[in-house]
Swiss-Prot record:
Additional notes on this entry: 2 of the reaction center chlorophylls (ChlD1 and ChlD2) are entirely coordinated by water.
Cofactor binding note: The D1/D2 heterodimer binds P680, chlorophylls that are the primary electron donor of PSII, and subsequent electron acceptors. It shares a non-heme iron and each subunit binds pheophytin, quinone, additional chlorophylls, carotenoids and lipids. D1 provides most of the ligands for the Mn4-Ca-O5 cluster of the oxygen-evolving complex (OEC). There is also a Cl(-1) ion associated with D1 and D2, which is required for oxygen evolution. The PSII complex binds additional chlorophylls, carotenoids and specific lipids.
UniProt: Fe cation binding residues: H219, H276
Residues the record lists as binding [CaMn4O5] cluster: D174, E193, H336, E337, D346, A348
Protein name per the record: Photosystem II protein D1
Catalytic activity, as annotated: 2 a plastoquinone + 4 hnu + 2 H2O = 2 a plastoquinol + O2
Cellular localization per UniProt: Plastid, Chloroplast thylakoid membrane
Binding positions (chlorophyll a ChlzD1): H122
Keyword Transmembrane on entry: yes
Keyword terms: Calcium, Chlorophyll, Chloroplast, Chromophore, Electron transport, Herbicide resistance, Iron, Magnesium, Manganese, Membrane, Metal-binding, Oxidoreductase, Photosynthesis, Photosystem II, Plastid, Thylakoid, Transmembrane, Transmembrane helix, Transport
Gene3D superfamilies the record matches: Photosystem II protein D1-like
Amino acid sequence: MKNTFNTSNVFANAYSFWGYVIGFILSTSNRLYIGWFGILMFPLLVLATVAYIAAFIFAPPVDIDGIREPVAGALLYGNNIISGAVIPSSNAIGVHFYPVWEALGFDEWLYNGGTYQFVVLHFILGAGAYMGREWEFAFRLGMRPWIFVAFSAPLVAASAVFIVYPIGQGSFSDGMPLGISGTFNFMLVFQAEHNILMHPFHILGVAAVFGGSLFSAMHGSLVTSSLVAETAGDLSLNVGYNFGQEDETYSISAAHGYFGRLIFQYASFNNSRSLHFFLAAWPVIGIWFTALGVSTMAFNLNGLNFNQSIIDSSGHLINSWADIVNRADLGMEVMHERNAHNFPLDLA
């Protein structure tokens, strides 16, 4: 019997199969774009989410300070949604990479807070892949790349508190806990140890967040209030709007005229591109600065301080808000890790 096996057909089928797979991955017609970055993003974020939910519910107490006094963060150990958290890795681990195979067993890995590193590292890498996917999808559609630049702001902010700060402080136990009250605890301790409220870059971040909220509300309300009416007065404005139409749906000149007279002329934009660039750039740049500030304070380049009180020519103390802030910082610091050391560094 003649052998009819043909290797060229096998390679052709293989190429056609992989061509189909690659075409599906890179297709911009899918309901959910995948892309090369999506191959990384989807499994990483799924793993991070599943591990976070499981740890939040079931994880046993973690020896966060490395002094054999475990702290419980899971719901099954008496916490609620507010007090629960994924507790950071033990101070005994430091900044060592701590996958499960580095522990003697799974119980030891849980006791030392290995779940924190697992969730944080998978999440940061997954979020980075999401940012890359934003660029990739925009590239496929012929769009400009600024969407992924904007997303870099929350990504670098998360990286600052989850990665850079623990590295600078020498231990992942100093990272931000993955919970509501844990976040507040992190903020209070950060203020106590670094005086972040007096750091110029944090001030820029506050201006970015609150200013961005204000500008967003102003822009949305102005646009909604200056829609071009294409219908009779008894019909909704939406009836005269067709999705994808070339004509603008609102009058920027009317909005500009209104706001220019409400405040003053040059407080209002008359160019849509400049306006939307400003709306994107303001919060993004401010959050970049905050992330940079946290990253520098990670290495103890702290906010402005007033460690020496104000005194008059006779040597008498002149009470100021700086004294109150210092006392508040010391009070927060003595309550932080109160069993791990006898005195805070500022008092020792």
